[in-house]
């Protein structure tokens, strides 16, 4: 029995059995960020400080200890204030230190400032210089020991083992065709394993006793000779430091520093755990350096592999890859800063007088501050947050990247790393990843996954005992899961929790198989546990091809928040949690009653009488220029509970994600206007603001100090009429609420002009009239081409107010323009199933195809977009949406619903359409007989005639994507040129031209359009003198002169000459007597503009033409 949940006017119907709905609630979706940062503050920072303590000077007289406790001061600015002032939301760190003078026994204790640490906001982001940033989680190879099987040149199996620490030298053991064991330290030359083991001070007996097959290693001892400890150390030194005289102490020191010094070598907690697990050791977790026991056990496992005992490792298995989140990445950065700090402290201890030293004079916060700043400002993993809509924000915080420092690079990453691995099940989404060069390197955390203390991804399972679910939930990592028989989340279960299916499909050791219910160990908690949040918002996901689902998941993140958000008629039940965890909606922290509601804030009185205020965001600009605005959804007097939603954010409605609009669709061709993914829409979507969005843009101008005096922000602008200044106030800054078009002045600014800046006629006037006219140049901030909008905010920053300005600036003015963008031809719209298209025509309502009751459809999609792309989910969604619209209800359909009956989606849609037909009483709503089941006869709006055959009609959820034609359309008449090649720049931002590339040249060559081609490659591009003369000729109405030499050709010649190749151009001149001579042409000559003005033009090139360049 479906349960009805009422929200607003439309009842919600959850379709699917109560046992399999996500009744197991999702975890907090931003937990990965917050938990990691909390760990850093509670443990990570202290751990790093203590690892550097004590710092002693070179003589050993002074010692500086860092103590356990550190303090954080209150942040200087709040989050909102930091955003407004363009500063960083951070706290100051103070740490207790103790300076001990060993000679006098004097002890000084002091709290020392060690730097500023950016604080995470409660939404899991950081505010750096006023911009919200996210630290992306990195997925890297875990430290530990890895065994690999390789074939040598003769095709014989050999094995090797790599011992990878968290930081320090790599150790590689390998066997060869002669059954000898070798070792490499940090990819240097091969060294016999005997040498290393003897250098560690082990005797023959200790070595051979550690092995299961000592006879195998005996060969290496016999072949390589038996070394004493001293000889082994000398040999080791020779191999690692060739060319230096070897000494025993040198060898000893080399070994110590490489593997046994905690400062230089660290396995990390994870490395030690993995090593103990793989080699079955019981070394304590606090021992983070190598022990002889580790090395012996590694070699023993390697030898056992030769006897088919044990197994090689799969490095793409998630048991061997771990996640480094904010906390750990930050900790590594702090270590870098402390390393630099340690050197400075040592030097200061040595240089200064011992009596005058205090901890504060020793510790300089600069290196630590610089390291942290560098990480947040320029690391590949610190990214400008994607704030297009709440889902984009949420997904960005849950992203997993294999790129970045210590990770892979795009070029080196092969196919295996990018591919889906069986261990991704329930941990990394197999669907959501970018298209293009980063495919497979950037992923998204699955809905229920979490990261454990070692950094491995875990996923929850329900425990099964004797074929019955016990209700207990257990999180398993990828390598733990391999040992159990695990059934999928859509297994049929009865009321008592007994598994009904027999046999059950299970996964065991990365293979699919069958088992009886009694053999099953675990069942997945939910069918959507394998996909990410964005993917889980796609209804009928199981009916879509994975490639299209990928596009659907990625495009939801690009949906622009619309003016009036509307929830989907067909959802999946996760919209509420996605909106809540994105942080865009306001959630009550207490139980209580609403005492005040306005557009600015909401106040709640708790049960103890205390009032809490929740301020609302209004028309703020997001990182992507979309609009962030919150609307209250409660009224005064309402009782609210802790966790209830008080206000909607952008792209949410009723506390649920609402990225698009439900619109009436017909799948049919229409006059070729929806050929190749083009889309035909009705005027209604424009006039009723169905797809209208608000965009807020920021414009900024600085008044700087120049050599000739300060720039001034003023209303007094030379050569500008009063009409252009009508929207400026007395300071010369635009007033809030003014409507601005392209070219209007936002902020008036004048710059002092030097003598050299003046044209000669002005100098002449000056000389005659002797008056010093105001020597300033207009440098105002104007609205750029193609932009218009209303001024919603103006902010002025000056030093007097205490704002931090960039060096050299006296004043910064920032103007925010908001514009309403209606949907128009060229905009990109998409559904949730990867069905995307560009709007090709907007038809009047009366011309659109209409239904039997006279309703015109809103959008016409091409039916050919469905079969070959195999995203049939959109058809199910359309039909169920049609039923929902007729019945006035909304549906929540969990994906993967076939556990109780085959083709469950089809039965559900059929059942609901039958119900819709009964409720409306219109037989045409659903025809379930005849040839055209589920299709509706539509009529041509232009003629009123019925179309050839019935078509599929229904409600589909479409989104307008951020690729708006307004931001892309661009034209250039004249504009800037590149300095080197003298060709026009590219791109809208640079006012660039259209690139006429190699293939376009082929096209003109194929048509033999020689003159057009010559013009394109010369005067329209980089023939410098030619283009000026051509412009001159056009202006004066004369014939266009003949093109000269393109600049890029000269650059090519110069480059060849710089390589030492003598490249010159010659032409053959025919004399009057018929003889010819060879003349060298200087291509560079016309740089000085000495080109003869009377050069032949196209029209006066008469007679026998000689293909030659005129001489200058």
From Swiss-Prot:
Enzyme Commission code: 2.7.7.6
Keywords carried by this UniProt record: DNA-directed RNA polymerase, Nucleotidyltransferase, Transcription, Transferase
Secretion signal, residue range per the UniProt entry: none
MF GO annotations: DNA binding; DNA-directed RNA polymerase activity; ribonucleoside binding
Gene3D superfamilies tied to this protein: 2.40.50.100, 2.40.50.150, 3.90.1100.10, DNA-directed RNA polymerase, beta subunit, external 1 domain, DNA-directed RNA polymerase, subunit 2, domain 6, RNA polymerase alpha subunit dimerisation domain, RNA polymerase Rpb2, domain 2
Reaction equation(s) it catalyzes: RNA(n) + a ribonucleoside 5'-triphosphate = RNA(n+1) + diphosphate
Subunit structure, as described in the record: In cyanobacteria the RNAP catalytic core is composed of 2 alpha, 1 beta, 1 beta', 1 gamma and 1 omega subunit. When a sigma factor is associated with the core the holoenzyme is formed, which can initiate transcription.
Similarity comment text for this entry: Belongs to the RNA polymerase beta chain family.
Name of the protein: DNA-directed RNA polymerase subunit beta
Provenance organism: Gloeobacter violaceus (strain ATCC 29082 / PCC 7421)
């Amino acid at each position: 029995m479906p349960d009805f949940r009422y929200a607003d006017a439309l009842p919600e119907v959850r379709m699917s059995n109560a046992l399999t709905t996500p009744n197991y609630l999702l975890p907090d979706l931003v937990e990965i960020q917050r938990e990691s940062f909390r760990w850093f503050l509670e443990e990570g920072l202290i751990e790093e400080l203590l690892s550097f303590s004590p710092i002693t000077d070179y003589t050993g007289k002074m010692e500086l200890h860092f103590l356990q406790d550190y303090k954080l001061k209150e942040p200087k600015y709040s989050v909102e204030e930091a955003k407004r002032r363009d500063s960083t939301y951070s706290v100051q760190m103070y740490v207790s230190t103790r300076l001990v003078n060993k000679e006098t026994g004097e002890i000084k204790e002091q709290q020392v400032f060690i730097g500023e640490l950016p604080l995470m906001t409660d939404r899991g982001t950081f505010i750096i210089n006023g911009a919200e940033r996210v630290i992306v989680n990195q997925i890297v190879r875990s430290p530990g020991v890895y065994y690999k099987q390789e074939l040598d040149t003769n095709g014989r199996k050999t094995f090797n083992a790599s011992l990878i620490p968290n930081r320090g030298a790599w150790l590689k053991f390998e066997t060869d065709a002669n059954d000898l064991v070798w070792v490499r330290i940090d990819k240097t030359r091969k060294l016999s394993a005997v040498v290393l083991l003897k250098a560690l001070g082990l005797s023959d007996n200790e070595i051979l006793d550690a092995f299961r097959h000592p006879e195998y290693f005996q060969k290496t001892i016999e072949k390589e000779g038996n070394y004493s400890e001293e000889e082994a150390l000398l040999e080791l030194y020779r191999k690692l430091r060739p060319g230096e005289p070897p000494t025993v102490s040198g060898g000893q020191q080399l070994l110590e520093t490489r593997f046994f010094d905690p400062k230089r070598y660290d396995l990390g907690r994870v490395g030690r755990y993995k090593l103990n697990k793989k080699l079955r050791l019981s070394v304590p977790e606090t021992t983070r350096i190598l022990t002889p026991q580790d090395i012996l056990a590694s070699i023993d496992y390697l030898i056992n592999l030769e006897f088919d005992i044990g197994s090689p490792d799969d490095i793409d298995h998630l048991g061997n890859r771990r996640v480094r989140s904010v906390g750990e990445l930050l900790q590594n950065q702090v270590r870098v800063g402390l390393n630099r700090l340690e050197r400075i402290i040592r030097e200061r201890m040595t240089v200064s007088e011992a009596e005058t030293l205090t901890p504060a004079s020793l510790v300089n916060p600069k290196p630590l501050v610089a390291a942290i700043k560098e990480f947040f400002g320029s690391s590949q993993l610190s990214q400008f947050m994607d704030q297009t809509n709440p889902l984009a924000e949420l997904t960005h915080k849950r992203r997993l990247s294999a790129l970045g420092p210590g990770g892979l690079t795009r070029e080196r990453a092969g196919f295996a790393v990018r591919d889906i691995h069986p261990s991704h099940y329930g941990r990394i989404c197999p669907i959501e990843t970018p298209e293009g060069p980063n495919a497979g390197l950037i992923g998204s955390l699955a809905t229920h996954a979490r990261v454990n203390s070692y950094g491995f991804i875990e996923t929850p399972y329900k425990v099964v005992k004797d074929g019955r679910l016990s209700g207990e939930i257990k999180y398993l990592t990828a390598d733990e899961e391999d040992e159990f028989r695990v059934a999928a989340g859509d297994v049929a279960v009865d009321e008592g929790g007994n598994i009904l299916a027999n046999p059950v499909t299970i996964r065991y050791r990365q293979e699919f198989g069958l088992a009886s219910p009694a053999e099953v160990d675990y069942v997945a908690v939910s069918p959507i546990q394998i996909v990410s949040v964005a993917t889980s918002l796609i209804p009928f996901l199981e009916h879509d091809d994975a490639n299209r689902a990928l596009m659907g998941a990625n495009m939801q993140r690009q949906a622009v928040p619309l003016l009036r958000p509307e929830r989907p008629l067909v959802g999946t039940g996760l919209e509420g949690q996605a909106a809540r965890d994105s942080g865009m909606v306001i959630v009550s922290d207490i139980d209580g009653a609403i005492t005040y509601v306005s557009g600015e804030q909401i106040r709640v009185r708790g049960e103890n009488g205390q009032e809490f205020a929740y301020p609302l965001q209004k028309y703020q600009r997001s990182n992507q220029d979309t609009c962030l605005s919150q609307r209250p959804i409660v009224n005064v007097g309402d009782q609210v509970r802790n966790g209830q939603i008080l206000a909607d954010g952008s792209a949410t409605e009723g506390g649920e994600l609402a990225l698009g609009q439900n619109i009436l669709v017909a799948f049919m061709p229409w006059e070729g206007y929806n050929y190749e993914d083009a889309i035909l829409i009705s005027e209604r979507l424009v006039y009723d603001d169905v797809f209208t969005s608000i965009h807020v843009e920021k414009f900024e101008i600085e008044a700087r100090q120049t050599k000739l005096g300060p720039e001034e922000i003023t209303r007094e602008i030379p050569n500008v009429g009063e009409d252009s200044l009508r929207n400026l106030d007395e300071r010369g800054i635009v007033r809030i609420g003014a409507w601005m078009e392209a070219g209007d002045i936002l902020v008036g600014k004048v710059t002092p002009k030097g003598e050299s800046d003046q044209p000669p006629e002005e100098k002449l006037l000056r000389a005659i009239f002797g008056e010093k006219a105001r020597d300033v140049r207009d440098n105002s901030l104007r609205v750029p081409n193609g932009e218009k909008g209303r001024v919603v905010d103006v902010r002025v920053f000056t030093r007097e107010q205490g704002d931090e300005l960039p060096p050299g600036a006296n004043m910064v003015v920032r103007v925010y323009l908001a514009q309403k963008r209606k949907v128009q031809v060229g905009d990109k719209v998409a559904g949730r199933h990867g069905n995307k298209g560009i709007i090709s025509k907007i038809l009047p309502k009366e011309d659109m195809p209409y239904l039997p009751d006279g309703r015109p459809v809103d959008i016409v999609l091409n039916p050919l977009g469905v079969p070959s792309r195999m995203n049939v989910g959109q058809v199910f969604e359309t039909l169920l949406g049609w039923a929902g619209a007729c019945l006035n209800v909304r549906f929540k359909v969990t994906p993967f619903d076939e556990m109780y009956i085959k083709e469950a989606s089809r039965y559900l849609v059929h059942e609901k359409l039958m119900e819709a037909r009964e409720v409306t009483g219109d037989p045409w709503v659903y025809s379930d007989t005849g040839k055209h089941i589920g299709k509706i006869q539509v009529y041509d709006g232009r003629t009123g005639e019925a179309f050839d055959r019935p078509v599929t009609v229904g409600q589909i959820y479409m989104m307008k994507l951020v690729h708006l034609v307004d931001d892309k359309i661009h034209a250039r008449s004249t504009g800037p040129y590149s300095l080197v090649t003298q060709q026009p720049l590219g791109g809208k931002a640079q006012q660039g031209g259209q690139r006429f590339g190699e293939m376009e040249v082929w096209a003109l060559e194929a048509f033999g359009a020689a003159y057009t081609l010559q013009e394109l490659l010369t005067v329209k591009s980089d023939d410098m003198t030619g283009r000026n003369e051509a412009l001159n000729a056009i202006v004066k109405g004369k014939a266009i002169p003949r093109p000269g030499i393109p600049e890029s050709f000269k650059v090519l010649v110069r480059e060849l000459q710089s390589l030492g190749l003598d490249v010159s151009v010659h032409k053959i001149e025919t004399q009057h007597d018929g003889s010819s001579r060879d003349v060298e042409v200087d291509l560079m000559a016309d740089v000085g503009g000495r080109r003869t003005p009377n050069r032949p033009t196209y029209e006066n090139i008469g007679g026998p033409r000689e293909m030659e360049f005129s001489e200058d």
